[in-house]
């Protein structure tokens, strides 16, 4: 009986490799991660624009969302206009010394090989890592 349940259950993907030009595949994968969130989403990504905000809007109602990024006047405007009409996405200025990108979905941490907005334009990987969200966030202070 357990074998049948395992056979019928979808496999949990913990890593994915996207080739150059696989923009839709990468976007769909990130979208599925965002939709899985029950409590919180935290994105750590130096390069965010309105495409990222559209992606994060796929989260369920009541899921808190925070983005750690470097923001320019345009990014500030994107967040301001977004938050006037949609569920708030909080923003926190990111240090210049942060290179890697992370997507935290509840208590899972995913390492992104490219910015969420650019995923699939070039070869990139998304992989679930065994860090706690608190461990990653502690390095942002």
Describe the function of each predicted region.
Residues 1-26, 36, 47-141:
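PLD/PLD-like phosphodiesterase catalytic module centered on the HKD motif
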Residues 30-32:
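Exposed extracellular interaction/assembly regions and N-terminal maturation sites
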């Amino acid at each position: 009986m357990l074998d049948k349940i395992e056979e019928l259950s979808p496999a949990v993907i913990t890593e994915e490799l996207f080739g150059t030009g696989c923009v839709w595949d990468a976007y769909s994968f990130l979208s599925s991660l965002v939709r899985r969130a029950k409590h919180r989403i935290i994105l750590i990504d130096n390069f965010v624009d309105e495409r990222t905000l559209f992606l994060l809007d796929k989260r369920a109602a009541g899921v808190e969302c925070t983005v750690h990024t470097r923001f320019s006047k345009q990014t500030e405007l994107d967040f301001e206009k977004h938050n006037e009409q949609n569920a708030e996405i909080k923003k926190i200025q990111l240090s210049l010394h942060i290179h890697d990108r992370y997507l935290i979905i509840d208590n899972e941490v995913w390492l992104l090989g490219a910015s969420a907005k650019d995923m699939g334009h070039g070869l990139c990987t998304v992989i679930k890592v065994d860090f706690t969200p608190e461990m990653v966030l502690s390095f942002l202070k």
